[in-house]
């Protein structure tokens, strides 16, 4: 089957890889001159299935009000003048109760754990290089309340069979030795030993090269004007004066998916702006070993070979990509506070990207009402964590194979009234 994939970020390229491996003739289209040059370029670098959780959580509405008056707040909102933003925020607020949080986190962890397994298999099969580390993730708590709240997430981890360690502050240095110097600032941590780290851009570009060698065609520097449809199916992609035709089409444009699908399929994907610093390592024994998550500031500190990536924060501000100095100061403050000897912060590269977020935090993966239009978007801050699993799942569905995990509650249909997913663990055949 001829398949066109729109988007060459980590999700689009992973989709191309798995569809090619399933025997399809794949073409990837992107406006950029190469793969992973937008949202996948400099994300936090963590592959943390156990920490997969929606921003829509109990207590967030009240916290959001408090954060409005804090200099280093992890969340900021600025109205962009669109009804879509208001509707999206309202849907997000409706997901902030405990029952929705547990449901959403459960399916996010399910997909993320599966994705980590897919990445492990891909690594074993291809020996793909991306400065990966398999040293786990350590979530740090600065208050006793945060430490106590961890028990809520532990319930989900236990249900999913995810191993963990809940550590008091005196034991944090067993996992991250450099934290011995700052343990007095912390109340404890939650460590997930099976989590990983890696450079998402390096992974995506290397996978794109391997996919191209396997027969995938990449059409870079090719802006997409619109999808052409006749009411029942898509019959082409208009790129300037050219119409590119295929048997199936996959939307993986990230935050830009919503606008491209306007008038065809309504999807609640909105850009969530984030920032990162990439810092050269100064002292090896003062740098992180793997990934740290600062629960207070919602910031991740990730170790690559000779660099530290510091990333996080969420701004609901539309498609604004301005680099704001106060955000840089927050990232610098957190990394200096936890790893004062770790990196040459003054030499850091500052970056921002737009993560495609759904109100419930879960991506939309699967077929639409059009029989040949498929979605793989809306992964929010977890595109790197979920990319391989989402790509494999999409490939299975499009190819008519039964996926390895429950999938019905991952489709855009969950936003339809009256939608009832199958019981967990029960799998139907593909729709196609």
Curated annotation (Swiss-Prot):
EC number per UniProt: 1.4.99.-
Cross-referenced Pfam families: DAO (PF01266)
Q: Where does FAD bind?
A: 3-17
* Cofactor section: FAD
- For this protein, what is any one GO molecular function term? D-amino-acid dehydrogenase activity
Which InterPro entries has this protein been placed in? Answer: DadA (IPR023080), FAD-dep_OxRdtase (IPR006076), FAD/NAD-bd_sf (IPR036188)
Q: Name one GO biological process term.
A: D-alanine catabolic process
The pathway it acts in is: Amino-acid degradation; D-alanine degradation; NH(3) and pyruvate from D-alanine: step 1/1
Reaction(s) this enzyme catalyzes, per UniProt: a D-alpha-amino acid + A + H2O = a 2-oxocarboxylate + AH2 + NH4(+)
Entry keyword set: FAD, Flavoprotein, Oxidoreductase
Q: Which GO terms describe its cellular component?
A: cytoplasm; plasma membrane
- From the UniProt annotation, give the residues forming the signal peptide: none
What is the role of the protein in this entry? Answer: Oxidative deamination of D-amino acids.
Q: Which family does it belong to?
A: Belongs to the DadA oxidoreductase family.
What is this protein's name? D-amino acid dehydrogenase
Instruction: Give the originating organism.
Output: Shigella boydii serotype 18 (strain CDC 3083-94 / BS512)
